[in-house]
Amino acid sequence: MGTPSELVDKLMSDIGAIADDIQDYVRHPGADFTRMRKMGAGDVIRALVCMGAGTLGHELDGFLEAPKACTPSAFCQQRAKIEPEALLQLLLRFGPGVPARAADARGIRLAAVDGSEVVMQRNPRDAETHSPKSNGSGIGYNSVYATALLDMAGGAFLDAVVQPGPAKDEPAAFRELADRCDPALVLAGDRNFAGYNNFAHCLERGVGFVIRLKDSFAARLLGAGPLPDEADEDVELLLSRSRRAELRADPG
């Protein structure tokens, strides 16, 4: 499998599989998508994946055949029934199925980790994604932050973590991706992901990593010197009720 038509067929098959189990991914199981509608669960997911950047009305025009035409309002109602987990599961099903080029002579497969902010329609009532700060407009904006894992050999996204924009935490997203990825991958990340916690997390998980360091971080790391065999250290401590300087200088 590697031709464009084969990849499209694989994507449509994976969408169909998610739609068949849609009750696992709806907000109200047993109620949502239990009646026949112009747009079923598979149609909604396919639209979310395949739509362009035009207005919703323009994108819906021609998406379904005339007898099944759907208004933007009806589409939004159907879309609201589906949990984001459905799209994550679609990504996890489809991404690993994209054929990758062979690893290098050492058997190494690199996967890049990077994040990007996605600005959405402004909605001050959505406190989770709304930020009052903006580029001088003073009205704020809504956003989410997506940290994705890209197979550099196959060019396919393997996984992603989406967080509210105002509360983004790239190191935490990195650790979540490291937990879910194939241990055979080597994760490559920029300076935002550098940290002892992330390094230790990958080592415990058995995942290789190549992360760019800030100059100050690298200097501290290289200047740390060899670590002792144990963390325990003997210290002498004087306990006294006196605060006299002479006693502190010569406690003997």
What is each residue range found by the language model?
Residues 1-252:
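Conserved, well-structured functional cores that handle cations and Mg-NTP chemistry
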